[in-house]
Structures are given as structure tokens and as C-alpha cells.
Regions:
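Active-site neighborhoods of metal-dependent hydrolases
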Residues: 174, 179-180, 185-206, 210-233, ...
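Metal-associated gating/positioning segment near the N- to mid-region
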Residues: 91, 96-169
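Histidine-rich, glycine-flanked metal-binding segment
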Residues: 48-54, 62-107, 123
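Bacterial N-terminal signal peptides that target proteins for export
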Residues: 13-32
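Extended hydrophobic/aromatic segments used for targeting, binding, or gating
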Residues: 242-253, 257-286
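Glycine-rich, proline-tolerant flexible connector loops at the mouths of alpha/beta enzymes
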Residues: 147, 229-239
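Divalent metal-coordination and catalytic microenvironments
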Residues: 60, 80, 101, 112, ...
């Protein structure tokens, strides 16, 4: 059984884009990233009274999301708020649910969702999240719903052709179509780079960097909760550390967080963690590392030092957290099996060359024999089967 992650809504229908809700969510997320749930007690502001409850959940084992041991309690709800947590035997309610010693917890937060368009084209599909106990969905990882270029195509939504450029417009569409979960977005710096610079391996001029910063500012004003990167994928792979600091510093003015799929998760893992920490330190924001791992068996020993780097940053006063997925597989686009240098002229230009047999032979040889880059063929066992 799951209670809403903000411990105040029970209908699960509101998108959390308005300032008070965002501020509360930011505070809760920052405090509880490592467990990806929000404290049931710490984020509830509803006061109990002696009146009847609308709903009373009894005989529950409560896991509050704050790292505490579970405890037995009853939960009283009035309207869309949790009114009381404790021993409520004998209290009246319009509806009583016997939890029968099951666990009751705050709703889980999906820390890295990637269904930006699906939420609009098929809102009921979000029910699959609810059935897993997920009540808040954080979307991003370099790519994001906004900003979009005026040249980006419209999206087919329930019979309508809709386009948007900003998060403000995107959130309006979410509210118009309605979704059954809370939705939170960061601004993907891949998106920002693509709108201003395209897909090529180029560095921004001073004027272009200011344009990129303005896009981040607009996204934060519209309700984004931070910036995100996916630094193994073009064109994000071409961004310098300094560029990422400058853009994330803008998000820091709004209490934002830096979320990152780091530049390397294998032989250069430690350098990638150092870069993530440097970006957070330079921008003055908390850092959250997506799916921390040491890919490739030869790199497994690096994990101890990786955790030591994070612990050291935390001991020094930085807010650095990470998540790990509980399986040994990896999902990645086939384009990531090729060296990023091949995309320097843009993805479309590279794809036009793939019909050349000589290039295809060169690509295969490079994948099978080199390792001075994050070569995922090497990490997964060097076997095409």
C-alpha cells in the first residue's frame, strides 16, 4: 500500500509545477534522494483533530521513507490530507481499510523517467507506475520535454496535433489532458545545446552561451527542478565541464539540482565522478548521479574508490547522492557502441555515410579492438552473440 509521496495528496492527479508544491518537493527530494522516497512525517503539515476520518487505515507496518525502522501504526485521512499517524483504535471513519500487517509507505519516486511524450499521447499508461507504488515521476537525463526548437515536429495527442517550445506550454498540456501521477521535470542540457548549437561538435560563443543560459532560466521559471546531462551521448559528449557549470549555476539560483548520467561509467569512472562533483561545487548545487556503476568486469574494483569519492565530498559538506538499479543488465542505444567522434558533424550526416562498406569495416574493427573510449561492446563481453 502506498501513500502519496508528498503525504498530502491522496487522489494522485495533480502535477507539481506550482511554486509551493515545487519548493516542498525540492526540499523532500534533496533530503531523501538516496532512498528515493519522501518522509511521511516530515512532509505532512496536516494537524489531527478529534473528528471522524474519511479514511482510516489500520494494522499497518509503516515505512516512513526517512531510513527509520518500520513501526506499527494507523493512518487517518481527511479529504486529500493525512491527518494523523499513530494508535487510532476506536476512531470513527467513513471507510476503514485493514492493512492486515502489510507495509504502508509514501509513494516511490521514479528518479529517471523517460516518457515525456507518452504522458501526453496516452495518459492512462501512467497507471502502470501507480501499480508499482510510484506516485511521482522525475523526467529527464540530458533529453527533456523542453526547450524545443520551433522546427521540432508536432506530436499527435489523442487526435490533436500539438507542439510546444517551453516547459510552461508543456505543463499546460499535461494539465489539460490530465495524468494520474505527480510529474516533475529537469531541463536536459542536451536539449539546451541542441536548440542553440545543433548536433555538431562545436563550442558555444559567448553570445550562444548566454542564449543557452536564458533557456535554462526560462525552464526553471516554468517549474523545472534542476539540470540534467547524459554525457556519453552526442551532442552532450561535446560539452565542456565549464559549459555545464555555467548552465547549472543558473538552475542553482532557483534551488535546482544537477542530475547526471556521467561522462564515463567504466575505465574513467573516477574522473567522471570528480567532474560531476566539480560541476556541483562550481554551480553551488546538489549532485545526483544516475545509475552508478563500474561497467566491465575489469573495472569492478573501481567501485570502492568511487564510493570513497562520494563519501569524501559529502564529508566536505557537499550534497552528493546516487542511485543504482537492482539488475546486472544495461539498456543503451546502439549508436553508443560507436566512438563519439563519428557524430562530430551531426547524427544525420553520419547516417548518410553508413552505406560505405569500407567505413562499416573500419567501425567494426574500431569497436572490436580499441578501448580508449567508453566501448560498450567491450563492457558486455566482446561477443556479438
Amino acid at each position: 500500500m502506498m501513500l502519496p509521496d508528498n503525504a498530502q495528496r491522496t487522489d494522485g492527479t495533480r502535477t507539481m509545477r506550482h511554486a509551493p508544491a515545487l519548493n516542498r518537493l525540492r526540499n523532500c527530494l534533496t533530503a531523501a534522494f538516496s532512498v528515493a522516497v519522501v518522509s511521511l512525517i516530515g512532509c505532512s503539515s496536516a494537524a489531527d483533530s478529534d473528528g471522524p476520518f474519511d479514511v482510516l487505515i489500520t494494522n499497518a507496518r509503516v515505512v516512513d521513507g526517512a531510513g527509520n525502522p518500520w513501526f506499527r501504526a494507523d493512518i487517518g485521512i481527511r479529504g486529500d490530507r493525512i491527518a494523523a499517524v499513530g494508535a487510532l483504535v476506536g476512531r470513527s471513519a467513513d471507510r476503514t481499510i485493514d492493512a492486515e500487517d502489510r507495509v504502508v509507505s509514501p509513494g516511490f519516486i521514479d528518479m529517471m523517467g523517460q516518457a515525456t511524450t507518452v504522458l501526453l499521447t496516452d495518459p492512462p499508461s501512467a497507471e502502470s507506475k501507480l501499480r508499482q507504488g510510484i506516485t511521482t515521476y522525475l523526467s529527464g537525463e540530458g533529453g527533456s520535454a523542453a526547450p524545443r526548437s520551433p522546427e521540432d515536429p508536432a506530436v499527435e495527442m489523442q487526435g490533436d496535433q500539438r507542439a510546444w517550445q517551453t516547459y510552461g506550454e508543456y505543463f499546460q498540456l499535461l494539465e489539460h489532458y490530465g495524468i494520474p501521477i505527480n510529474v516533475v521535470h529537469d531541463v536536459g542540457l542536451t536539449q539546451v545545446r541542441r536548440v542553440v548549437l545543433g548536433d555538431e561538435d562545436v563550442q558555444p560563443t559567448a553570445e550562444q552561451l548566454e542564449e543557452m543560459k536564458l533557456l535554462v532560466r526560462q525552464a526553471m521559471e516554468d517549474g523545472a527542478v534542476g539540470t540534467s546531462t547524459s554525457l556519453i551521448y552526442p551532442p552532450a559528449v561535446y560539452a565542456t565541464t565549464e559549459e555545464l557549470i555555467e548552465l547549472t549555476r543558473v538552475a542553482g539560483e532557483y534551488g535546482g539540482v544537477y542530475f547526471t548520467h556521467m561522462r564515463n561509467e567504466s575505465h574513467a569512472l573516477l574522473d567522471a565522478i570528480r567532474e560531476a562533483i566539480a560541476i556541483g561545487s562550481g554551480a553551488g548545487v546538489p549532485v545526483h548521479i544516475y545509475h552508478l556503476k563500474a561497467a566491465g568486469q575489469e573495472n569492478w574494483p573501481l567501485m570502492a574508490d568511487a564510493l570513497a569519492l562520494i563519501d569524501s565530498a559529502r564529508a566536505g559538506g557537499m550534497d552528493v547522492t546516487a542511485d543504482i538499479y537492482p539488475y546486472i543488465r544495461n539498456g543503451i542505444g546502439l549508436g553508443s557502441f560507436l566512438h563519439p567522434r563519428h557524430y562530430a558533424g551531426g547524427t544525420a550526416a553520419f547516417l548518410e555515410t553508413l552505406g560505405d562498406p569500407a567505413l562499416r569495416a573500419e567501425l567494426r574493427l574500431e569497436v572490436e579492438t580499441t578501448s580508449d573510449w567508453e566501448n560498450w561492446y567491450r563492457h558486455v563481453g566482446m561477443n556479438w552473440d
